[in-house]
């Protein structure tokens, strides 16, 4: 990916810092609670894409620098921040074109654990968006596991895709889509609620594709393949097959590998947010 360093006042790099919150989320069955978190990644041994559980008794404390970042880590952080800025610029333009006002989210890089307005999480939760504080949270070491454990190609555009996917969840929060889904899920069975989650996640993949469409000047040969490889690796069917050897469609919350690639490509090829109604396409 062709990129130049971009800076944002809404970007925080907390890597190498301890304190500022006690990570309470570890393992076990994770369910839907008050705030639905649209998780991209997940926990080893559990389906990538689980819902993050809100925790109680989160502790806050003084933050202290515990280690210096390596040059490679700093560059990766600069890349993530730049992708975040490219996303905010693109969605500001799209919202302007549709006579809407875009509210810029925040983004936080962290190591090991983090406390958010939606609760506390370990890195095992994977990248996620918290609607409570409208911030994207990410431990960049997730992408090492994406390659080594789930077979993604890797590459910088895989990171760009995930950031764009999480930005898609912010778009859904602004538009009220996430709130409507939570309301509907409260009235549905678990299986029907899972189908709504799949629609929400695939729409975020579609929005990631729309972002890529608007940023053709940044894309190099092989970049789209990196994004599709990441999407393929985190399909519910692919993850369940690798982690348990069994595929249970009724438990899907993010969609199959094929669906995730399909909706990203649709967004990328069209660049038209009006074509991203995954709910009508999948539920009717």
Where are these regions (language model features)?
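Long amphipathic alpha-helical segments used for membrane anchoring, targeting, substrate engagement
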Residues: 1-67
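Short pre-active-site segment immediately N-terminal to the catalytic Zn-binding motif
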Residues: 142-161, 192-198
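Acidic/histidine-rich, surface-exposed loop or edge segments in extracytoplasmic proteins
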Residues: 60-77, 142
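Post-HEXXH active-site segment of zinc metalloproteases
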Residues: 173-201
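Short helix/loop segments within enzyme catalytic domains
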Residues: 74, 78-102, 192-195, 199-240
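Active-site recognition of the HExxH zinc-binding catalytic motif
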Residues: 91, 138, 161-174, 204-205, ...
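Catalytic zinc-binding patch centered on the HExxH motif and its immediate surroundings
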Residues: 113-139
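Pan-zinc metallopeptidase signature
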Residues: 234-284
């Amino acid at each position: 990916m062709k990129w130049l360093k971009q800076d944002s006042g809404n970007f925080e790099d907390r890597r190498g810092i301890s304190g500022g919150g006690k990570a309470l989320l570890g393992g076990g069955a994770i369910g839907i609670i008050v705030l639905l978190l649209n998780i991209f990644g997940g926990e080893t041994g559990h389906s990538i894409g689980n819902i993050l559980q809100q925790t109680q008794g989160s502790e806050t404390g003084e933050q202290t620098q515990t280690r210096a970042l390596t040059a490679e880590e700093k560059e990766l952080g600069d890349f993530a921040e730049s992708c975040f800025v490219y996303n905010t610029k693109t969605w500001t333009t799209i919202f302007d074109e549709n006579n809407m006002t875009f509210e810029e989210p925040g983004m936080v890089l962290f190591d090991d654990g983090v406390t958010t307005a939606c609760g506390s999480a370990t890195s095992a939760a994977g990248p996620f968006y918290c609607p409570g504080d409208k911030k994207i949270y990410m431990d960049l070491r997730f992408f090492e596991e994406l390659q080594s454990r789930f077979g993604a190609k890797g590459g910088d555009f895989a990171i760009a895709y995930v950031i764009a996917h999480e930005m898609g969840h912010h778009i859904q929060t602004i538009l009220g889509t996430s709130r409507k889904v939570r309301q509907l899920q409260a009235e549905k069975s678990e299986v029907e609620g899972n189908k709504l989650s799949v629609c929400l996640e695939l729409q975020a993949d579609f929005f990631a594709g729309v972002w890529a469409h608007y940023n053709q000047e940044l894309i190099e040969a092989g970049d789209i393949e990196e994004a599709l490889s990441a999407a393929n690796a985190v399909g519910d069917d692919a993850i369940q097959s690798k982690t348990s050897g069994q595929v249970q469609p009724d438990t899907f919350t993010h969609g199959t590998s094929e669906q995730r690639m399909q909706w990203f490509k649709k967004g990328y090829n069209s660049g038209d947010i009006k074509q991203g109604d995954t709910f009508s396409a999948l539920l009717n």
